[in-house]
Amino acid sequence: MSNIEERVKKIVVEQLGVKEEEVTNSASFVEDLGADSLDTVELVMALEEEFETEIPDEEAEKITTVQQAIDYINAHAQG
């Protein structure tokens, strides 16, 4: 597991209050992890802060699974 993947999963666990083993790469934030729209906004903000990047709203709307978040961060983050 990459450092980015670990960090993304840790943020998901903290933000959504779910168990680590529930946070699989294919897990959907809404369907599998029970997030609502406010949770997803807070999750995006936490990812932006952790990885020092800006995630535009139109991009954030496309990030619906753990893997999509990992892929976005891999493509756009500085650290």
Swiss-Prot record:
PROSITE patterns recorded: CARRIER (PS50075), PHOSPHOPANTETHEINE (PS00012)
Boundaries of every Carrier domain copy: 2-77
Pathway: Lipid metabolism; fatty acid biosynthesis
Annotated keywords: Cytoplasm, Fatty acid biosynthesis, Fatty acid metabolism, Lipid biosynthesis, Lipid metabolism, Phosphopantetheine, Phosphoprotein
Record-level Gene Ontology MF annotations: acyl binding; acyl carrier activity
Pfam families: PP-binding (PF00550)
O-(pantetheine 4'-phosphoryl)serine: residues carrying this PTM: S37
Annotated localization: Cytoplasm
InterPro entries associated with the record: ACP (IPR003231), ACP-like_sf (IPR036736), PP-bd_ACP (IPR009081), Ppantetheine_attach_site (IPR006162)
GO cellular component: cytosol; membrane
GO biological process terms, semicolon-separated: lipid A biosynthetic process
PTM annotation, UniProt: 4'-phosphopantetheine is transferred from CoA to a specific serine of apo-ACP by AcpS. This modification is essential for activity because fatty acids are bound in thioester linkage to the sulfhydryl of the prosthetic group.
Entry similarity comment: Belongs to the acyl carrier protein (ACP) family.
NCBIfam families: acyl_carrier, PRK00982.1-2, PRK00982.1-3, PRK00982.1-4, PRK00982.1-5
HAMAP family: Acyl_carrier
Function as written in the Swiss-Prot or TrEMBL entry: Carrier of the growing fatty acid chain in fatty acid biosynthesis.
Protein name: Acyl carrier protein
Protein species of origin: Thioalkalivibrio sulfidiphilus (strain HL-EbGR7)
